[in-house]
């Protein structure tokens, strides 16, 4: 696969400690992808801070998935895809609504991306949900 670090960068939505959430500006496939990122290996650590942040990582993923199912695109998504990557010493969960695949992507690998203003609106709405975690 031809993934680059740019596929995991985007509009910063929320950060708490070492856990961060963004909306991709260069999605891999869909036009809307949420990245939830944490230091790699924290779930296996005995350190109290690592354990607390591992829990927060899981909670942030749940909030992102609920947002995709209930609010993004008017709550029309009935399912989602969730992928995990290790990149640059971090574990990144990439969450995206599951839609019928775009023929532009299948035939030409052209990803459809939302307008920046739409991404900013989604970022604000998702941030409000994530703020309830702390």
Language-model segments: residues:
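HIT superfamily nucleotide-processing domains
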Residues: 1-134
């Amino acid at each position: 696969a031809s993934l680059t670090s740019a596929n995991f960068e985007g509009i910063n939505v929320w950060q708490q400690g070492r856990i961060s959430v963004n909306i991709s500006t260069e999605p891999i496939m869909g036009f809307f992808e949420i990245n939830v990122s944490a230091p790699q290996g924290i779930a296996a650590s005995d350190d109290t801070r690592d354990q607390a942040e591992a829990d927060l990582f899981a909670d942030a993923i749940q909030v992102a998935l609920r947002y995709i199912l209930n609010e993004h695109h008017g709550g029309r998504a009935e399912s989602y895809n969730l992928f995990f990557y290790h990149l640059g010493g971090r574990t990144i969960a990439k969450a995206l609504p599951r839609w019928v695949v775009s023929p532009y992507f299948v035939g030409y690998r052209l990803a459809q991306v939302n307008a920046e203003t739409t991404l900013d609106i989604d970022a604000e709405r998702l941030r409000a949900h994530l703020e309830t975690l702390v």
